[in-house]
Amino acid sequence: MRLNVEMAKIITQIYEVQKPAEAKQLIEIGVDHIGSVIVSEDNWKIPLIKETVENIKETASKSSLIPLFKKQEIIFKILDYYSPDIVHFCDDLSNHNNVKENYEDLLHLQKNVKEKFPEIMIMRSIPIVQSGRTETVSTIKLAQIFEPVSDFFLTDTLLTAKSNASTDQQPVNGFIGITGKTCDWDIARKLVKSSSIPVILAGGISPDNVFDGITYVRPSGVDSCTATNAKDENGGLIRFKKDFEKIKRFIKKVRSAEKEINTA
């Protein structure tokens, strides 16, 4: 059972950071995990991201890298090239009926990564339905399947249709994340209690709700992407560009929640 009654420092994790200058600012602000994304297996070698990862390695922060593709051969190449602290897999696990045999390819990939790159930690996104929707995926069962080959779990929001049926309309087809929608915190709290590895709370986490998320779910860390993005002149969110004032507020709220829990 894992419930962080006596909590150490809560991990702060920010995605999607693709440039060294942005990473430098996040390090100065005090972000613990700084995540980048490789969006194409045809164009996976990106010197700016490599420089970003290398610069993070020289600090107390850790780099995390998401590959938005599944070919083991290409994933091994990017791990060789970038050498991140963490590789983060965020496949949509919701359409495999929660049967272990249906996840053998993904489990095999994670086992192989652990064998070939023992210095790289593995983060696995676990889908949780959007707040207010009927549970359509067995989050806890999925976590039990992947826990032996993972170092961290990250909760993320699975978009479902209004009928509560699963939908393929995730922002990136075949993967979960960057929805800007809050996941069901009751399920996330159950995952924290049942998991023997650290759980990072993600899914619509912002400076406005992160305090409540931490004090209710009691995760080991919190992750923000969409809600800490910059906005254009029309108020639209800009992917791959961060709003550093939002992130400063985010960090301040995290440390306040951390203090609240540790002194309760």
Regions flagged by a language model, labelled:
Residues R2-A60:
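Basic, often amphipathic N-terminal segments
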Residues P20-A23, Q72-I75, L106, P207-F211:
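Short, well-ordered alpha-helical microsegments
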Residues L26, V87, F153, D184, ...:
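Conserved, mostly hydrophobic/aromatic
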Residues I38-D42, K57-D80, P84-S196:
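Conserved anion-binding
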Residues L48-I56, N97-V113, A165-N173, C225-A264:
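C-terminal helical cap(s) of enzyme catalytic domains, especially alpha/beta-barrels
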Residues I200-R218, N229-D232:
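A C-terminal functional module that forms or caps the active site or interfaces directly
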